């Protein structure tokens, strides 16, 4: 009660913001007559003047009224479109880093030009993010006319572009592209081995179009770049030879009595969970067998950190041999292991078991072993977009998800009023007992609209339902178009004409999104075709264009008289927002329209959440077959069900983010280290810091902190330094000579000797030459161990929920163990880099250059890169890297060395020319 009272007195937060923005709109409108007097060149010159004022310290907020007035005037001249006052309000909303909810057809694309222009004046770049490549190119070409007219440059960042083309796109003042491509470029930039290969600038300001689709619907699937790891065929074959020598235990021991074992063995196998566990005796037997096979050092344990992968491979081999059976779980076809779906019995061609199990089965069956896929880099959209200095978004439907935008991204949602009040009539839902009755009613409604000349958009939740309705319409001989969000350019054209009289268009939720449905059809497209045709004389062009416009005006009035665009929805989506998006396609710019949802008790949402209640009402009213129930209580029940699903989905996304935040913090540290290494001209201090840490760790293994001489193992320390680090340090002699030597003195002595030895090595070839080798060693080590760390985090994540059974908080356990894994990663990099640099024997400049290039080539040797990303229809796509495909086609050609002249004859080095594609 009190919040409502306060709102009625002071107005809501949304109303107060709109009031504040309207005051600025008055200032912009007052400037319009002044800017109308300027010539085109004078208007364009304003851009340079604004840039200078920003450089001199003026803020963008101070420039806003003038800049918005310039964009509005430029748009009138370049696009023949004038920004409405509500679009100016929307522009301010986006500039202030908020989400603007603007109804479909109110001109979001044009609205975005205002904050884009203003923020581009700072010279740091602005990214406009769209849901698909077609929209990115369309908007860049369409709005690019305005930006170019005002003196700004525009770039399009698309897939399959060369590095140089991407760098040019990012260097532009305004860059259009898809969410997937921006994210993948960020990941690729953090995999390069040279600064010149990076494409992105700093992440300054992004405006996300259809922000709900990108930041909510697609946020459950991370972006992943993966590639084939190093070939471990030999290891799989050798472990496959060990697995048959281990005996399966029959029966399981009771933890209290120890009874229950029928026949003792080396491991137990659980057919239900498909897991194996070694017994105590089995561990000892396995260690002995692995040592005999030369896979395990004599006396080492399978539990040692260094042998974790060995244990993993042994378990995979035992599972493959005892729990996965040919012609039950898989078949062998054409020399490949193909998985059989245990529920349907169908072959799942192309699918592979993870964790090395598939390779273990291949080794068991004696077919060629295919390399394991390894995650090279990954990031969620939540964590990528939160890196921008300023983030804004626009959509037709955000208010239902306002809480999530605020909670996850810190983005406030502002509902922007329409330019003209809506005239769309949203009718109550009709609920039928069966799907068959529902579809009959849908077809009847479509037939009625078709006969009256009213255009219909039929919304479905799946491609399967689209095709079902299409078949029903064919049966009744009703002409129609079907869109499934697959061919964006063609679908945009069909959607643009979906407002013509008698048009029937069936579309899944996402199909044709971003394109307005204009009543009477889209005359602009047809005008563009005539203008682009050079064969038509100029006078004839004008006559034809006028004829088209007159014809359209007649059709427009005809459709308005028939009731505007009718939305017929065949099912409720689990999200109210997506239902609202469908409704919002009708009634644009104050046009008439209508919408209705046809439901059945067999729909998943009804069945799970509201079915029993509605069924009881139907039975009480004794509804005959084919009759529908139409009541507010039903619609409210369904909305309540949708709220429950939305809350559950929000919890899933929030939980995903909480886990990903752990790896994100670690990702930032690793990527920052990589960037420091790439940009640093001299790595001596960094290497010295690592060397000091490594030497301290080695000494502390034999000489504990604050210990006395009797506790020191001097012979052991001298042996390790000599054998593993090639350091001859006379520690024993020094200890005998001195009366008061401490453990700290020993650390100093070893560190000093290591520094002197290393300095001598660097002096042989020169500091500048050796620095390139140091950089290659550091990057190679960080990248290799980071990939292994990502796999380790993945393993940890998959089983962490089981900690709940032990009364432990899985999230806290994940954070703690992930931190321990990360500390181990940093220690491993420190020891690996120092050991390699201390023990490598380099005597000439040529040797150091060759060694650095060999490491770079190894870093680039990861093959068959694939990109995993969410799709608009809610699925997940896995695409091959175009550069990898080119490299595979070139594989038969003898490869040139990195520094050899490129075979194409350009005169450049191979690595700077076609070597980049490989």
Swiss-Prot record:
One of its GO terms (biological process) is intracellular protein transmembrane transport. PROSITE patterns: SECA, SECA_MOTOR_DEAD. Monomer and homodimer. Part of the essential Sec protein translocation apparatus which comprises SecA, SecYEG and auxiliary proteins SecDF-YajC and YidC. The gene is secA. May bind 1 zinc ion per subunit. This is Protein translocase subunit SecA. GO terms for molecular function: ATP binding; metal ion binding; protein-exporting ATPase activity. It catalyses: ATP + H2O + cellular proteinSide 1 = ADP + phosphate + cellular proteinSide 2. Gene3D superfamilies: Helical scaffold and wing domains of SecA, P-loop containing nucleotide triphosphate hydrolases, SecA, preprotein cross-linking domain. It is a peripheral membrane protein. The keyword DNA damage does not apply. It comes from Methylibium petroleiphilum (strain ATCC BAA-1232 / LMG 22953 / PM1). Belongs to the SecA family. Its cofactor is Zn(2+). Part of the Sec protein translocase complex. Interacts with the SecYEG preprotein conducting channel. Has a central role in coupling the hydrolysis of ATP to the transfer of proteins into and across the cell membrane, serving both as a receptor for the preprotein-SecB complex and as an ATP-driven molecular motor driving the stepwise translocation of polypeptide chains across the membrane.
